[in-house]
Amino acid sequence: MARYRHSRSRSRSRYRRRRRRRSRYRSRRRRXRRRRRSRRGRRRRGYSRRRYSRRRRRRY
C-alpha cells in the first residue's frame, strides 16, 4: 500500500505543475491584449496602479 500511495502523490504534483504552466501562458496572452485596450479606460476611471497590482498578485 505504501508504494501505491507514493505513486499517487507523484502524479498529483505533475498534474498541478502542468496546470500552472498553462494558466500562466494564457494570462500572459490576455494581458497583452487587455493592456492595449484598457490603458485609456483606466486613466479615465482613475484606477491606481498599486491597487490593480495587489489584486493580480492575490489571483495568481
UniProtKB/Swiss-Prot annotation:
PROSITE patterns: PROTAMINE_P1 (PS00048). It is found in: Nucleus; Chromosome. One of its GO terms (biological process) is sperm DNA condensation. Residues 1-60 are annotated as: Disordered. One of its GO terms (molecular function) is DNA binding. It comes from the Eukaryota. Its main location: nucleus. The keyword DNA-binding applies. InterPro entries: Protamine_P1 (IPR000221). Keywords: Chromosome, Developmental protein, Differentiation, DNA condensation, DNA-binding, Nucleosome core, Nucleus, Spermatogenesis. GO terms for cellular component: nucleosome; nucleus. Testis. Belongs to the protamine P1 family. Protamines substitute for histones in the chromatin of sperm during the haploid phase of spermatogenesis. They compact sperm DNA into a highly condensed, stable and inactive complex. This is Sperm protamine P1. It comes from Petrogale concinna. The lineage of its organism: Eukaryota, Metazoa, Chordata, Craniata, Vertebrata.
